[in-house]
Amino acid sequence: NSSEFDDKTKYPVIDIMSSQKKIKKKGATMRLGSYGCNLIGKSKAYESYGKRKINERHRHRFEVNNKYRSKFEAKGLVVSGTNKELNLVEIVEIKSHPWFVATQFHPELKSRVVNAHPLFKSFVGACIKQKYGHL
């Protein structure tokens, strides 16, 4: 259900960004660079960053198709981070899972050995808590 793999898919849950649809020679036409993302409170993303507005680095041309967003939210998917300017889904979570967080951006591009990305720290912390019952 992704137009990245099947451009004639009946249900393009993941679809090419509208700004990319008319471009024939894709080349370096991706959404590249650092973009703002607004987080909702009481989410794993917010708990990880400790703030409502973040900036993260991107390298892609496909996005969650907002046409399907409410259907996923009705089944328990939490859209915890969005780019308000373009109305793009940036982070999703499954609230009932100990730590299911998926991002559209690349947190590894802002992580360093001596300064791990907030999402990586949070993920490792959740793994330790799951195994040992505490941090």
PLM regions and their residue ranges:
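Amide-donor transfer/coupling interface in amidating biosynthetic enzymes
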Residues: 1-135
